[in-house]
UniProtKB/Swiss-Prot annotation:
Keywords: Viral occlusion body, Virulence. Belongs to the baculoviridae p74 family. The keyword Flavoprotein does not apply. This is Protein p74. GO terms for biological process: viral life cycle. It comes from Orgyia pseudotsugata multicapsid polyhedrosis virus (OpMNPV). GO terms for cellular component: viral occlusion body. Essential for virulence of baculovirus occlusion bodies for insect larvae. The lineage of its organism: Viruses, Viruses incertae sedis, Naldaviricetes, Lefavirales, Baculoviridae. InterPro entries: Baculo_p74, Baculo_p74_N.
Length: 644
């Protein structure tokens, strides 16, 4: 009989992803009602989304879930203050190290899951990152590292103080207005920074006035700057330098009531939510129940937080052609075995297909890592499959369950791919948290390599950054940001979605279990695969239970992805190695026995005569005996490690 193709498995995963996203809306509302979201529902199209079987045409949806503008702001977290990084106990406040105040330790840093934040070892693991909402209605991650460098001079170096580098007022920080680079921050000079070096703010940089240049030409710039800084009382400020208030020219730090900010953050609610309507999302609603099929006209349903719903007719008039069985043109992918274990084993052993699907999803890994991923997936997936089988009221056959397992495996790989992006974002945050100890070293080397320092510069006069430095530094950080996110140096804007934070709302096991029902529905609705073969999945024997432990063991064994040829080659190499090792070490036992005898004689002589010489002989003979005892197994395992 025919089986699902790679195209069918991918389509099943897409269907399950969209339907799970629909149910995820209610879960998000229950867990994080104060983080507002937008979503769009439309009838799925076989041309644009996934193949829609005729039996699902009235239920198949394409769902997009995103943060609203207010929700994006609520998720944002900047984790740096003037002299370090925030912790779970750091209250919300502002820095005033330049003319612009910068908020830090927002509630999203540690209050998305407060219980998790208070666990031992989680003090430095922020739960979100810093985001901005673009004119294109996207919530994107920004480059907080450059913002930290501009706003917190103390974090620029590991060793304090380096005159003119970390004992200075900060740059003014503002988001880049260029819509092509919403992730970027720009640094700007200010009067307080220029005053630190005896200059004035002129045309966006620190310079002498024309008459000061004449005086400097006569006296020398260093002498003139020294007298000017002395007159402005800057040296006394440097003796008691305050990193939180680095200059009297700067405005006072804004006052902040952290408890009030936290309470306001938690109190946000979306008053436009239609709770009764959204309850349907967990009940597999039809297009008619959602109001998306008005007299045969398909509608797109868009929800905007704090505004409500809007309906627009969708652009396409048809939802894709229905597949027609073409047995004569179908590839030979048939399988006659109705045993569930055989179906699972056969699918896993066809590693070219499975590995190809993983590559299409976006995984770039060695076969060894892929095997490990398969084993981890199967350990959790098969128990969930049994729970689904017990919980469903649908008639399930052996072949239907086997094909659902295949789709679930592909769907699990898709979920891991999504979580990889989330992990990248969290990795950036973790790197930022360690900036004062790790990135700081890189930054100081970068700074020292790009600045021309005087041989003797006790006040850091020559460490003043040139006019172009903030823009150059910002571009450098932005390049590193893109390269960290994507090894292919992609410059596409990455939108961060609520599902990237799914681990706060639901566990992986729950998500996998719920998705199995959608996968079962999709596979059961398929009548013809992408090759044009009739599936007839309901014609095999019904299955009501299976041995979970046996199936897990079978899956783990099949996940090894060994062929018979590989096994025979392994056996041949192993036998050859054992024979070589035995021939090369025939005398090891005899020599070890002789040394053990000498060890016993030396020990007896030492006990009888109490002379140090006999003890030395005893120690030498004992070490030699031990060497010859372990020599053979050591050489064997060393060779095995090299070969295998």
């Amino acid at each position: 009989m025919a089986v699902l193709t790679a195209v069918d498995l991918t389509n099943a995963s897409r269907y399950a992803g969209h339907m799970h996203r629909l149910e995820f809306i209610n879960r998000w509302r229950e867990r994080l009602p104060h983080i507002l979201i937008d979503y769009t529902l439309r009838p799925a199209s076989s041309d644009d989304d996934y193949y829609v079987p005729p039996n699902l045409r009235n239920r198949a949806l394409a769902v997009k879930l995103a943060f609203s503008r207010r929700g994006c702001d609520s998720m944002s977290c900047f984790p740096f203050h003037e002299t370090g990084v925030v912790s779970s106990q750091t209250p919300f406040a502002y820095t005033q190290t330049s003319e612009t105040s910068v908020a830090y330790a927002q509630p999203a840093c540690y209050h998305l899951d407060r219980a998790a934040a208070m666990r031992e070892g989680a003090e430095n693991e922020v739960q979100s990152a810093e985001f901005t909402y673009t004119p294109n209605n996207q919530c994107v991650l920004v480059d907080s590292t450059s913002k930290m460098y501009f706003n917190s001079p103390y974090l620029r170096t590991e060793e304090h103080t380096i005159m003119g580098v970390d004992d200075v007022p900060a740059f003014n920080v503002r988001p880049d207005p260029d819509p092509l680079f919403p992730e970027r921050f720009k640094g700007e000079f200010n009067e307080a920074y220029c005053r630190r070096f005896g200059r004035d703010l002129i045309n966006g940089g620190c310079s002498f006035r024309w008459w000061e240049s004449l005086i400097g030409f006569v006296l020398g710039d260093t002498i003139y700057v020294t007298f000017k800084m002395l007159a402005n009382n800057i040296f006394s400020e440097l003796r008691d330098f305050d990193y939180a208030a680095p200059s009297p020219l700067l405005p006072p730090r804004p006052a902040a009531d952290s408890n009030a900010v936290l309470a306001q953050w938690r109190a946000v609610r979306d008053r436009a939510v239609d709770w009764d309507f959204e309850k349907q999302f967990s009940e597999a609603p039809t297009l008619q129940q959602l109001g998306m099929d008005a007299n045969g006209v398909l509608m797109q349903l868009s929800y905007t937080a704090e505004t409500g719903f809007t309906k627009t007719p969708i652009a396409y008039s048809a939802r894709g052609a229905v597949r027609v069985a073409r047995e004569s043109r179908a590839a030979d992918r048939a399988m006659s075995d109705d045993d569930l274990e055989a179906i699972v084993a056969s699918f896993l052993e066809e590693y070219a297909l499975v590995f190809g699907i993983a590559t299409d999803i976006g995984f770039d890994m060695l076969l060894t890592a892929f095997k490990a991923m398969l084993k981890k997936i199967n350990t959790a997936l098969i128990p969930a499959l049994k729970r689904m089988l017990v919980g469903t009221s649908q008639r399930v056959t052996v072949r239907l369950l086997g094909e659902t397992y295949k789709a679930a495996l592909v769907h699990s790989m898709n979920r891991i791919a999504i979580k990889t992006l989330t992990t990248a974002a969290k990795a950036l945050t973790r790197v930022a948290i360690k900036a004062s100890s790790v990135v700081g070293i890189v930054l100081i080397l970068f700074t020292l390599a790009d600045l021309v320092l005087a041989l003797w510069d006790p006040f850091g006069y020559n460490n003043m950054f040139p006019r172009e430095f903030p823009d150059d530094l910002s571009r450098t950080f932005l390049t590193a940001y893109f390269e960290t996110l994507d090894s292919n140096t992609s410059r596409e804007i990455i939108e961060f979605l609520p599902e990237f934070f799914a681990d706060i709302v639901e566990t992986d096991d729950d998500a996998t279990f719920q998705s199995l029902f959608h996968l079962l529905d999709y596979v059961a609705a398929l009548e013809v695969n992408s090759d044009g073969q009739m599936l007839a999945l309901d014609e095999s024997d019904e299955i009501k239970d299976f041995d979970e432990a046996t199936l897990v063991g079978q899956a783990l064994a099949s996940s090894s992805l060994y062929t018979r040829l590989e096994f025979m080659q392994y056996t041949y190499r192993q036998n050859t190695l054992l024979a070589m090792n035995k021939n090369n070490n025939k005398l090891n036992g005899v020599i070890a026995g002789l040394f053990l005898t000498n060890t016993a004689v030396a020990l007896a002589a030492f006990i009888a005569h109490k002379e140090l010489t006999f003890f030395v002989y005893f120690a030498i003979f004992l070490m030699l005996a031990f060497y010859y005892l372990v020599k053979e197994p050591y050489e064997y395992f060393k060779t095995v490690d090299l070969l295998f």
